[in-house]
A protein has these predicted regions:
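Aromatic- and carboxylate-enriched substrate-binding clefts and catalytic-loop regions
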Residues: 1-112, 116
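Long hydrophobic segments that form regular secondary structure
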Residues: 101-121, 125-127, 132, 166, ...
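Glycan-recognition and catalytic regions of carbohydrate-active enzymes
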Residues: 136-178
Length: 178
């Protein structure tokens, strides 16, 4: 059997779409399935009633690096203070083809990300997402430093502490699993 599903291309946030999403969650819960909403609006609180909602995109995401350079570390520093307050995010992390913004070039196949590998790895701990993903092809990770971390980093945490943060400037997050 299957454990869950990704539902995509719900690019609106009107009352009817929220009702449709709730119906998806209710039916999936009856069958003990998780749901990942991709290409969906910001969270509306449904995950409080339906904890089978694992993640929801509702963000400017690294998939946009295929056509622009707006998703970068400057964008990411807003996330813990804005979008993540509403719930876990489906966020494409782990791009190992990382370049600084001044060297970045748009490329549809094997795209680059405007970041650093260290930043990409840190975001797996900073951002809350119950469904850890990598956003690149297998060849981008084979034999690369940091890939072992991606294979073992937890997606749930027993304790989270934010020892220091300044809105839209920096955030330090410490998490414990087990």
């Amino acid at each position: 059997g299957i454990a869950g599903m990704m539902i995509d291309f719900m690019d609106r946030d009107d009352q009817e779409m929220i009702r449709i999403q709730e119906e998806f969650l209710a039916k999936a819960a009856k069958h003990h399935l998780f749901v990942q909403f991709h290409g969906a609006c910001k969270p509306s609180g449904l995950s409080r009633t339906y904890p089978n909602e694992f993640t929801r995109e509702g963000t400017l995401n690294y998939e946009h690096c295929k056509w622009d350079k707006d998703t970068d570390a400057d964008h990411d520093i807003h996330m813990p203070f804005t979008r993540l307050l509403a719930g876990a995010a489906d966020y494409h992390l782990g791009g190992f083809r990382a370049l600084p913004k001044d060297k970045f070039k748009i490329q549809q196949s094997n795209p680059y990300v405007t970041s650093t590998r260290c930043h990409m790895l840190a975001m797996y701990v900073v951002l809350e997402s119950y469904l850890g993903m990598i956003c690149d092809t297998p060849e981008a990770y084979e034999g690369q430093p940091g890939f072992e971390f991606l294979q073992t980093v937890p997606t749930t945490w027993d304790k989270t502490v934010v020892p220091d943060a300044s809105v839209n400037e920096y955030v330090a997050v410490a998490r414990r699993h087990g």
